[in-house]
Each structure stands twice: as C-alpha cells, then as structure tokens.
C-alpha cells in the first residue's frame, strides 16, 4: 500500500464457516459486517470536511482500503490493501451480485463470478458452448448476457433453460460431439465432475481440431484430491501449449473444491464496456451444493 495515501473505503467480512453451498451458505456481506463497518467508519479519524469512508462498496482502482476480518467475536484482523486488481476491489474478495437472484443451480453464481473476474470479452450473440451443462445454472448466466449457448450434457436440463430461444441442448458427452458442431463456437466453458486431466483431455481434442476456432475458455477444474493443487502450474502450461498464451487460475469465492481457469488466445481482446448484466426477473430457488 502507498504510504500516506488516504483511506476512503472500508471492507469488512466474516470468516466463512462453511463451504459455499452448504446449508444455503454463500459468501458475501452480512448484517454484522455492515454494522461493524459502519462503526469503524464513524470512529476513523479524518479531516473535518471529509466524508466518512464508504463501507463494503466496490473500490475504485488504485484506492487505499482498510480491511477488517471478523475471525470470531473476540478476534478481528485489521489491515490495509491497495485495490490493484479486480478481486482486490471487491469486499472480502467476493464478487458483488447486485440484485440478481440465482436460479436453477448455484453454478449460476460461479459463472457470474468467473465472467466478472476474468473480464472475458464476450459479446451479445456470440456462440459459446458449455460441457457439463446440466441442470443449466451456468447456461442461464450466459443467456442472461445475451449469448447463444450450446449446452452439452447427457443429463436433463432445467425447463427454464430449455425454453430459452438462444439455447440448444446436445445430449452427449463432450468428447462424443462432432467437431464440426464446434466450428462456430467462440467461447468454451466446462464444469465436469472428473479429475482435471480428463477435463483437459476432452477440451484438447476440441480446441486443437483444425475446424475449431475457440478464442477463449473458462474451465472449472475439480480438485478431487487436494494434492492435485501442486499440479496447477503444469495444467496451465498444458493449456498454453494449445495456443492460449494468456492463461491464469483462481479459486473463486463461489468455488468449492475446485478452481477456475481463464484462457485467451490473444490478450489484446477487451471486454465491451456495455456488456449486458443480469436481468432482474430471476426467481429465487433452493440451490444445490455443487
């Protein structure tokens, strides 16, 4: 953090007591964190004419932020950080969901966060494919962005997704789909409950085919064994070897025992400023811990 730079924002969050999705728990601001933030803002010294610091708002790039982690009622951790990256701008590193209510499954939340974190330059009417799409939470998040979506999964999809005019269901496993069906796909997403090697085997067969022109990928890779975390650098190198030179990984706030890989062929691609956000009509539903 820059010494002497004024603190204009405060981020307060509680330690996660459960995995995301367990018993309805999801990370993010709570009534307690908001109240503690308000009290800290009132007590923080400032110039007489200066407004109190903002509490649990998305920080401006480069701003100085005071952190307070509520470990338990008797233990708080205090610190300061500079909002030098997208997750560093989010309170507690948790992607804000605005007023959206996820539907179908909590995969909706994971896709929302992966798009916000990666700044993947998707545009309305682009064609994307998701391997492992059932029951359709991720697909619904993509459809709400104005994308056209191929959902690839032998299992059934939710009726809300199936009825969307921009959705097509291919009831097959990813490696059983004809390569020409991917010829117009610009973005590839995966969320398959298998070890990372098997996910990447399927993806490699697709994106290295002569007829396929995928420009970017968001891959959810499962840590079926915690020791697999040691292989993450090698997994990223493998993806780069397919021509995706700009590749990075992060365990997102809404991830469970898994992490997200964002991969682009060209780093010069930029996300449009007018990207369509989530629609307000999403009905609340019970989320399964997947």
Model-assigned labels for residue ranges:
Residues 1-290:
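SAM-dependent transferase fold signal centered on methyltransferase-like domains
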